[in-house]
Curated annotation (Swiss-Prot):
Its EC number is 6.3.2.1. It is found in: Cytoplasm. Beta-alanine binds at Q61. This is Pantothenate synthetase. The reaction proceeds by a bi uni uni bi ping pong mechanism. The lineage of its organism: Bacteria, Pseudomonadati, Pseudomonadota, Gammaproteobacteria, Enterobacterales.
Amino acid sequence: MLIIETLPLLRQHIRRLRQEGKRVALVPTMGNLHDGHMKLVDEAKARADVVIVSIFVNPMQFDRPDDLVRYPRTLQEDCEKLNKRKVDYVFAPAVEEIYPQGLEGQTYVDVPGLSTMLEGASRPGHFRGVSTIVSKLFNLIQPDIACFGEKDFQQLALIRKMVADMSYDIEIVGVPIIRAKDGLALSSRNAYLTAEQRKIAPGLYNVMNSIAEKLIAGNRELQEIIAIAEQELNEKGFRADDIQIRDADTLQELTETSKRAVILAAAWLGQARLIDNQSVTLAQ
């Protein structure tokens, strides 16, 4: 496994891979890797000749400076895990390598609508930062496929739209959420949880299951369903942030013709803002 930190060296290897006709898969990450990331790597390995994992804590997508500062950086441990998985390349650039002129005045990629709705409304600039860095990685690495986790449901929808709108010839692969045995979705931010909070954390998944059961049963009183769910979360020790029930295919409000719903949930537990989602097939 080769660790690459500079753009010239990355471009050199990408040119060689292209000349050799290799099928390249990209797994973009911000590091602090867990089993969910390893599932992305496994999916990439099954679909390509060469796997490149990027590790870059992207300052452009953080809406709070304190969150950027305390985001876990575990490059050595991450590389050890990826080496065991027989990843071919790790691209781990410094911020100055990606944004040599700084963020002020940086050209960015913005996806209208999806960037500012739902999660984007509560985290201004977040999705603009995501689409910009992913676009830069696509331009640099020129992958044939790129793997993203379905845990970040809105982010995946945003990337798919960007790829379509910008005419990238890249297959976007969504990989299902990996959960702990108690149902908690694996996330780098779970590291913020205390031992006691970790015991409470699966409650978010349980509340989503309760919402799903009501939707499957035909209940469409969405405001009431959400209000009850928020109350349940608060009683469990969370601070409910945002719960939405949307059309899984459009992320717009549910209509009578919606075939699938997605439950999008975000809640604070101590210093950790946990997000999760669950898709439900609706009776027609």
